[in-house]
Regions:
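Conserved Radical SAM active-site core
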Residues: 1-148, 158-187
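Structural preference for beta-strand elements that scaffold enzyme active sites
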Residues: 80-82, 118-120, 151-153, 199-201, ...
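Short glycine-rich or small-residue beta-strand-to-loop segments that form or flank ligand, phosphate
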Residues: 122-124, 152, 324-328
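Auxiliary Fe-S-binding modules of radical SAM enzymes
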Residues: 5, 9, 144-145, 158-368
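Short loop/turn and capping residues at structural boundaries
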Residues: 84, 123, 153, 290, ...
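Conserved residues at the C-terminal ends of beta-strands
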Residues: 33, 84, 155, 203, ...
């Protein structure tokens, strides 16, 4: 069976066929350690299972793998393997993962690369740990594994308000975000001149934190890391622009509908720009409602971690319909992270709530 990185496997099991291999690390940035008590059990499961990397696209640290298991991956061509690299500095990786066996990452990557196993990498960037010179070192090391290491994403650490007893971590500010983008740009220049690819991609959040414009789609080389929030906003904008070009001149209903767009604070200005363009073409009255994350803490600004409780408390009624992105709800359900459902939100806001794919054309269609 062959599949691209972003493709679903296409198989659905009636029940869990695998006993999930749990994580043996204690990463300084782990978001599960920052969850409040009392949520559903599945949200506290820390998986670090290479089988789920292939089946579901999950990222793994490789600290769970034995030599025999690595040989099996090579023998059966189980790929791509999505790897949480974070740093290639052995001592730093052991310290960040709190695992004395975590330092052999370069040797593991070399083994897979030498045997033709495709990989994608992820770096959760923590100020004062693996940023700046350490980031440059890590990216230089990972460049050496191209093309088997096909792409690398760099995402900022997420910090909730539930950090009592955990390692002290700082969030990125504008200056740190700009410095990170500069380092990534230097590596991209080298990779483009040598291989014609950017190879490493900053998450959307870094551009917004830095106050820089989002790049166009050519920056992302086909969006290999879009599931990590890398290029999602650019892809949305360009698909919306294309849909608006097709719809231009085809006016919507004579009676204006009022549609509310619910999002996180991070994307609020971006969604306002999109709403203004869509409203001008569709005739729909669009209002954007950015939700402050009181549940996890106001430093969590992405839409995927918004809870139903915060929506009900903050979003005013009055629209004919409300749109929420599908990354706010659990897969194949209407449940948000706090088990509040879209039906609960509909009752509170006295209007329909529509779950919309993170796609500009779907967004335009949903407001009809």
């Amino acid at each position: 069976m062959e599949k691209d990185f972003e493709e679903d496997l296409g198989l659905v099991f009636d029940e869990n066929m695998l006993e999930t291999r749990t994580c043996k690390n204690n990463c300084v940035f782990c978001f599960i350690d920052q969850m409040p008590p009392g949520m559903r059990e599945t949200l506290y499961v820390k998986d670090d299972d290479e089988r789920l990397s292939f089946l579901l696209g999950n990222y793994v640290t490789l600290t769970n793998l034995t030599e025999a298991e690595m040989e099996r991956i090579v023998r059966y061509r189980i790929m791509p393997i999505n790897i949480s690299v974070h740093t290639t500095n052995p001592e730093l990786r052991c310290a960040m993962l709190h695992n004395r066996f975590a330092g052999s990452i370069v040797e593991s990557l070399r083994y897979f690369a030498d045997n033709g196993i495709g990989m994608n990498g992820q770096i959760v960037l923590c100020p004062g740990y693996n940023d700046r010179d350490e980031l440059r070192r890590t990216l230089n090391d990972l460049m050496g594994f191209y093309p088997q290491m096909a792409s690398v994403s760099v995402v900022p650490v997420g910090l909730s308000k539930y950090r009592e007893g955990l390692a002290k971590l700082d969030k990125f500010d504008a200056e740190g975000a700009r410095e990170t983008l500069s380092i990534i740009s230097d590596i991209q220049d080298q990779m483009r001149s040598q291989y014609g690819t950017n190879f490493v991609y900053a998450s959307d959040e870094f551009f917004l934190l830095a106050g820089e414009a989002l790049p166009d789609s050519s920056y992302y080389d086909g969006f290999p890391q879009i599931e990590n929030g890398v290029g999602m906003m650019t892809d949305f904008k360009e698909s919306l622009d294309a849909a608006l070009s097709e719809a231009r001149g085809v006016r919507g209903n004579d009676v204006s509908r009022r549609v509310g767009i619910i999002t996180g604070r991070l994307a609020a200005d971006f969604m306002r720009d999109c709403a203004q363009k869509a409203s001008a073409v569709s005739g729909v009255e669009l209002s954007v409602y950015p939700v402050t994350n009181d549940f996890f803490g106001e430093d969590i600004t992405v839409s995927g971690l918004i809870t139903g409780t915060d929506i009900i408390r903050q979003v005013p009624p009055g629209a004919d319909c409300y749109l929420i992105p599908e990354n706010m709800v659990r897969s194949q359900s209407h449940d948000l992270l706090d088990d509040v459902t879209t039906e609960d939100i509909e009752k509170a806001l006295q209007a329909e709530v529509r779950i919309v794919p993170v796609d500009g054309a779907a967004f335009l269609e949903a407001m009809k």
